[in-house]
Design a protein with these regions (language model features):
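Flexible, glycine-rich active-site loops centered on histidine and acidic residues
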Residues: 115-123, 145, 197-198
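Short Gly/Pro-enriched turn/cap motifs at secondary-structure boundaries
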Residues: 151-154, 178-181, 199-200, 225-233
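A short core secondary-structure module
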Residues: 169, 173-220
Length: 357
């Protein structure tokens, strides 16, 4: 394994930073009163202001035109299919250099769960690809990942949303919760139980459906506010007698769990890059402060206790970064089962969350 950053990856990251500095940052500064004042950013119902949504769309479209928005998507979906290592390092660079910016993450580079050409969409029928993918690729349309429920989070097999076939349609009923981008999405990748017997045995029985969010029977009841804020990005979805055509099944009937993992595992890798970048930014802030703040006639960075704390943080970040690179390398260079990648992903995320803490 050689973790030297390829020249091509460095060029991509530098080009992305130039795009952000020239296109996105000026747009943020021009609209700072809207973007960085919560009472302007959110409406009373917790949803983002329509003007905010318009700005986010403007950035998505510009990123797509510049070639960044789709660069990690599959080639069969119209992306560049750049590898996991480049994806990890790119997310790291964004989080490290542009922390907590309103129009950057996950807008310039979309989340594998929601916006952009997520690998889950490989399972779409060709007719649906022809109809929907162009708008998604261009950043004009966004998605949400309808898996989590009130009683089913990490335990995917605990979902209760059911789909019953009636003639050539599936009638779906249930509730989804903590669904990122649900209040704003144009489409939903919706997971439901289609075979209760297989589902009970945890051997299948879950199917993924492609749904337009303006369909009758699909309702976003409320936005779930982020702690300390007046609104949020996630929502609660009620599904009542939602009728979905047979051809809107993503992938194979009863095999939706595998499709879910396609999005989740990619998402874990991207999240790890964000955790590492955020931790690197936080460490720099700590070092800068330690070199500035003085007690007992010298900077606190000269006190051994503070040095130990900073050193331990640096070691955690170093370990997490190498764990993430190792995982990305294995995904890029070896063939592994979904279960093996799932285990790698969990270990990876644990290490990176520890680094952030």
């Amino acid at each position: 394994m050689n973790f030297t950053v390829p020249e091509e990856t460095l060029e991509i990251i530098n080009g992305l930073k130039q795009f952000i500095d020239k296109k996105v940052i000026p747009l943020e500064e021009e609209n700072a009163g809207l973007l960085y004042n919560e009472r302007n950013y959110y409406l009373e119902n917790g949803r983002r202001h329509p003007k905010v949504e318009s700005l986010r769309k403007e950035v998505r479209v510009a990123s797509a035109e510049a070639g960044f928005y789709t660069m990690f998507g599959d080639k069969e979906l119209g992306g560049e299919e750049l590898g996991p290592i480049t994806a990890l390092l790119t997310q790291e660079a964004i989080a490290k250099n542009y922390p907590n910016r309103k129009l950057i993450d996950p807008i310039v580079i979309p989340s594998p769960f929601t916006n952009g050409i997520t690998p889950v969409l490989r399972g779409l029928k060709q007719e649906l690809k022809d109809e929907y993918l162009d708008g998604i690729r261009k950043g004009e349309k966004t998605l949400c990942f309808g898996l989590t429920e009130p009683d089913a989070g990490s335990d995917v097999w605990g979902i209760k949303t059911k789909a019953v076939k009636v003639n050539n349609e599936w009638v779906i009923n249930g509730t989804k919760q903590w669904i990122t981008n649900a209040p704003y999405a144009d489409y939903c990748m919706l997971f439901a139980v289609t075979n209760p017997e297989l589902h009970a045995k945890r051997k299948g029985g879950i199917t993924c459906f492609f749904v337009e969010t303006n369909s009758t029977g699909f309702n976003v009841d409320s936005v779930i506010p982020v702690m300390g804020e007046l609104g949020g990005d996630a929502g609660i979805i009620s599904i009542e007698q939602l009728r979905v055509p047979e051809e809107n099944i993503i992938g194979e009937l009863d095999q939706g769990f595998t499709k879910a993992m396609h999005g989740i595992n990619n998402g874990r890798l991207g999240m790890s890059g964000k955790c590492i970048g955020s931790a690197q930014w936080a460490l720099k802030q700590a070092i800068d402060y330690a070199n500035m703040r003085k007690t007992f006639g010298k900077t606190i960075g000269e006190h051994q206790t503070i040095q130990n704390m900073i050193a331990e943080s640096a070691m955690d970040i170093y370990a997490a970064r190498n764990m993430a690179l190792h995982c990305a390398w294995k995904i890029e260079n070896t063939k592994k089962t979904t279960g093996e990648r799932n285990l790698d992903g969990k270990s990876l995320l644990y290490g990176n969350v520890r680094a952030c803490i």
